[in-house]
Amino acid sequence: MGKKKKQSKKDLKRRLSEQFQSTVRKSRIKECLHPKKEECSENIIKAHSIQNNKILSKISKNGNVIMPIPKPDNPFQLTTEYGRKRATVFTGFCGHHDQMFSPIEDCDFNYEIKQVFLYIYRAFAVEYHRKMEGVKQQEEMKKYTSDSIIDDLQLAFTLAKRDMEKDKEVFDAAILNNEFNILNYVVYDFDKEIKFAATGFLTPTDDLQGNKIQNLSDFEAKMSNLYFSVFPEENKSYAIVAALKNDESLTDYITSLKRLTQEEQINFINHLIIKGTENLVINPNAWYALTEEDKESFNYSFAQIEDFFGMPTDKGYQIKNQGFDLFNL
């Protein structure tokens, strides 16, 4: 018998890349999340979760942006260039219902309640859609491996999706009743145009004073989420952080966020983005101007190494220096 050919690193990388591409492709979900299903137009579109013409056009360079999302053909590279037309898209709305976002697509931010709602609702929608796809993706992954980590990931996605379904009921009712004052929120404004934009959510476990808010290990309890949207406009930038009013465990948390200094606000937004999203776009010129040390610090933070190893955190860690500052790009 001949010797079995040893699989090269190149062959292994190619095989893993092919598996990753196949898993991503088979896990895609095309479904309009708007509650008025009977009004849906025929086609589900590739909707931008961050405004294309208004924000991505401002941040992009030569039609490209940087995102911390590996591409299917190279799942080992974290920060990657994406074309503006592909960046931040998800198949979560039909063409008709995507028009509901025109008040934030076509108008400058003016602190109006409906605008705040739409920014936060879109942040919710993309994350809920990703949890739907995440559950499906872990099912696909089981075809390639029996590693227990897949079961753990599937449980995490399933629980997050379950909790966000409860949030969806509240968002849906607000849309159906045309009643948008359902959020406790804070808006931070900055007197410069930042070179990034982001949306996402975070499930905080402790407040800024180190007090426990909720326990992620309690699988029976419904977790409360913070949703956020950060974006530049003409000569200014804004960050909206919100929780549903019926998530009373976060009421005091939102109140404490209103008392932060601007330095603490910046640290907190950096913290939210590190912990709460990959839906982040960065201006390529700003990214490539960073030193390799700064890029490594960003990637290290984004990989959440401390969380993986269960490293302890100090009281108020959310508003302390996060190791890098997106506002300085």
Each PLM stretch: what is its role?
Residues P70-K71, Y128-E133, G276-I282:
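Low-complexity, flexible helical/coil segments
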Residues E105-M164:
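Long, hydrophobic, well-ordered secondary-structure blocks that form the structural core
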Residues P75-F76, A123-E127, H271-K275:
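Short C-terminal domain-edge/linker segments immediately following a structured domain
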Residues F157-L329:
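Charge-dense, low-complexity intrinsically disordered regions
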Residues K37-E38, K58-I59, F76-Q77, S146-L153, ...:
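Short, structured coil/loop segments at alpha-helix boundaries
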Residues L12-Q21, K26-P35, V135-M141, I149, ...:
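Metal-centered catalytic cores of metalloenzymes
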Residues I66-P68, M141, Q262-Q265:
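Short, surface-exposed linear patches
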Residues G2-E105, I113:
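An N-terminal structural lobe/cap that precedes and organizes the functional/catalytic core
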